[in-house]
Every structure is written in C-alpha cells, then in structure tokens.
C-alpha cells in the first residue's frame, strides 16, 4: 500500500530535526503548525505570532515522504518521475523550490560519495518494495528515484513556500492609476502570517495524484482498462509497464 505523509519542517529560521516517517504520522496533526516534532512546533508557533504582531509574514518548508511505491515507475526522459513530481510541487501556490533526496547538499558530494551502492534484496527491510533477489540500493541518498525511475525505496524531499505577500505592514510600491510612488501602501483585511501549515494537505494530495498517474501509466492499476487506448497510456509502450521490465 502506498502511504504518504508531509509535515512542516521549517518556519523562518526555526528548523525541526530529522524525524522518522512514523513520527510524522503520529505527531504532525497534533498541532496547528502541522509539525511532526512537538517541541519545534511550539517554537514555530511563537515565531509566527511575532511576525503576525509586527504586521509581517514569514516563509517555510514542507518535508514529505512516500512509501510503498513499486520499483520501475517512470522513464529516463520525458516521463521522468522526478520531473512530473517537480511539476506537481511547483504547481502548489507560493512554492519557490523543490528538492528530493540529498537535494542542494548534492553539490558538495563527489561522484563516489553520492553513488548509491546496490545489492540484491533479502526481504529484511520493511521500507523497501521489492521481491527477494531483486536489485535495490543499499542507501537512499537519491530519494527513491534514479534516472527518472523509482527504486522501490521511500521517495522523500522538501518543498519551500515563500512568505504571504499580503501583509498589513506599510510597503513602498507604484500606483498605476496616479503614476506615483506610494510609500505607505497597506493591504487591509485578514492575513495569513505563514503558508506551510495550510500547504501540507495540498502537497500530500499532489503526491498522491503523481503516484496514481504513474501507476496508471505503467498499467499497475486496472491495466485491462487502458491497454487498447493509444498514446502514453498504452501499457505495451510505456517504460513503467511491468511488461517492459
């Protein structure tokens, strides 16, 4: 079964420590910040209040993990899993960044350090989706994706959301009607001081849709319904199809 969970792992300069998938499941809905680390959630709440009282807003990040995705979904080029996933995540309003696996840290790794070693699965890792004897990575620095294709290991990454732009704090801008510079422009009304807590279910939904797309593309769900259809949904054609493994 595919299981997906996300949580807020950073608000401004307050960042949660690394937590397990189980901790995300257990704690992320216990607080209004939707952070899976209760102690950090309290600090985030205090920091959000500070910005709200100042009439300002703050950005943050959402961490996600996907388990149960079978190996072999995706393709090396136009149907690369991470490309479709990136498109889905960048479609979430206010998103300014998306990364998976090592993400930006990969820039500091050598090829030898970053390359995941592979082995033959012995059935001893609960988080792996593979049959005994099938090749799987030993580590998961690639975030469950290599060369556009799922490896059977958990897919994980992070989405960055910018601070809400509508704030009551006075700002300098240009008035199109008067063609004058305004030094005290204000947005009047209700203002969200932060977006990641609202973005968690959106990110989870986009993850589910992306995984479902690839399950359909690869004929992993009801293949008899799409075999006779032309184009990318032809399971004889698509690289994700079990027939092409």
State what each model feature region is:
Residues 19-24, 74-78, 115-122, 237-245:
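Short, charged low-complexity intrinsically disordered segments located at boundaries
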Residues 1-77:
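Glycine-rich, mobile lid/loop segments that gate access to catalytic sites or pores
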Residues 54-182:
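Glycine-rich anion/phosphate-binding loop at the beta-strand->alpha-helix junction
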């Amino acid at each position: 079964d595919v299981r997906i969970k996300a949580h807020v792992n950073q608000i401004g300069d307050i960042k949660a420590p690394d937590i397990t998938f189980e901790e995300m499941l257990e704690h992320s809905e216990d607080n209004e910040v939707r952070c899976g680390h209760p102690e950090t959630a309290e600090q985030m709440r205090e920091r959000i209040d500070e910005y709200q009282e100042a009439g300002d807003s703050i950005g943050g990040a959402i961490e996600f993990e996907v388990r149960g995705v079978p190996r072999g979904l995706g393709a090396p080029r136009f149907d690369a899993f991470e490309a479709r996933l990136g498109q889905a995540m960048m479609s979430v309003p206010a998103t300014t960044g998306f990364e998976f696996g090592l993400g930006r840290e990969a820039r500091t790794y050598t090829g030898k350090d970053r390359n995941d070693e592979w082995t033959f699965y012995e059935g001893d890792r609960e988080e792996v989706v593979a049959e005994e004897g099938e090749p799987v990575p030993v580590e998961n620095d690639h975030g469950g994706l290599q060369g556009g294709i799922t490896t059977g290991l958990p897919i994980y990454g992070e989405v960055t959301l910018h601070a809400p732009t509508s704030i009551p704090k006075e700002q300098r801008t240009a008035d199109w009607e008067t063609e004058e510079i305004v030094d005290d422009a204000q947005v009047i009304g209700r203002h969200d001081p932060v977006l990641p807590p609202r973005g968690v279910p959106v990110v989870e939904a986009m993850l589910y849709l992306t995984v479902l797309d690839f399950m359909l593309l690869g004929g992993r769900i009801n293949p008899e319904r799409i075999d006779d259809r032309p184009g990318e949904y032809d399971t004889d054609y698509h690289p994700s199809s079990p027939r092409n493994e």
